[in-house]
Amino acid sequence: MFTLKKSLLLLFFLGTINLSLCEQERNAEEERRDDLGERQAEVEKRFFPIVGKLLSG
Protein backbone atom coordinates (compact mmCIF):
# COMPACT_ATOMS: atom_id res chain seq x y z
CA MET A 1 0.00 0.00 0.00
CA PHE A 2 2.87 2.37 0.81
CA THR A 3 4.48 1.88 -2.62
CA LEU A 4 1.13 2.56 -4.29
CA LYS A 5 0.81 5.85 -2.41
CA LYS A 6 4.35 6.83 -3.36
CA SER A 7 3.68 6.02 -6.99
CA LEU A 8 0.45 8.00 -7.03
CA LEU A 9 2.12 10.93 -5.31
CA LEU A 10 4.94 10.87 -7.85
CA LEU A 11 2.46 10.80 -10.74
CA PHE A 12 0.55 13.70 -9.19
CA PHE A 13 3.66 15.86 -8.90
CA LEU A 14 4.85 14.99 -12.40
CA GLY A 15 1.42 15.83 -13.79
CA THR A 16 1.37 19.12 -11.92
CA ILE A 17 4.78 20.08 -13.27
CA ASN A 18 3.71 19.10 -16.79
CA LEU A 19 0.54 21.23 -16.57
CA SER A 20 2.55 24.15 -15.25
CA LEU A 21 5.00 23.97 -18.15
CA CYS A 22 2.16 23.75 -20.67
CA GLU A 23 0.49 26.79 -19.12
CA GLN A 24 3.71 28.82 -19.30
CA GLU A 25 4.18 27.86 -22.94
CA ARG A 26 0.58 28.79 -23.75
CA ASN A 27 0.98 32.18 -22.05
CA ALA A 28 4.19 32.86 -23.96
CA GLU A 29 2.47 31.98 -27.23
CA GLU A 30 -0.44 34.32 -26.46
CA GLU A 31 2.01 37.12 -25.70
CA ARG A 32 3.74 36.54 -29.03
CA ARG A 33 0.39 36.75 -30.81
CA ASP A 34 -0.48 39.96 -28.95
CA ASP A 35 2.87 41.49 -29.89
CA LEU A 36 2.31 40.59 -33.54
CA GLY A 37 -1.13 42.22 -33.46
CA GLU A 38 0.29 45.39 -31.92
CA ARG A 39 3.04 45.53 -34.54
CA GLN A 40 0.49 45.15 -37.33
CA ALA A 41 -1.59 47.97 -35.86
CA GLU A 42 1.49 50.21 -35.71
CA VAL A 43 2.33 49.43 -39.34
CA GLU A 44 -1.25 50.19 -40.40
CA LYS A 45 -1.19 53.49 -38.52
CA ARG A 46 1.99 54.49 -40.32
CA PHE A 47 1.05 53.08 -43.71
CA PHE A 48 -2.50 54.35 -44.28
CA PRO A 49 -1.77 58.10 -43.91
CA ILE A 50 1.05 57.80 -46.44
CA VAL A 51 -1.21 55.99 -48.92
CA GLY A 52 -3.94 58.57 -48.34
CA LYS A 53 -1.55 61.43 -49.11
CA LEU A 54 -0.29 59.70 -52.25
CA LEU A 55 -3.80 59.06 -53.55
CA SER A 56 -5.11 62.55 -52.81
CA GLY A 57 -2.05 64.47 -53.91
UniProtKB/Swiss-Prot annotation:
At which residues is Serine amide found? S56
Q: Which residues form the signal peptide?
A: 1-22
Q: What is its main location?
A: secreted
Positions annotated as propeptide: 23-46
Does the keyword Secreted belong to this entry? yes
Species name for this entry?
Answer: Amolops loloensis (Lolokou Sucker Frog)
Q: What is this protein called?
A: Temporin-ALk
Tissue-wise, where is it found? Expressed by the skin glands.
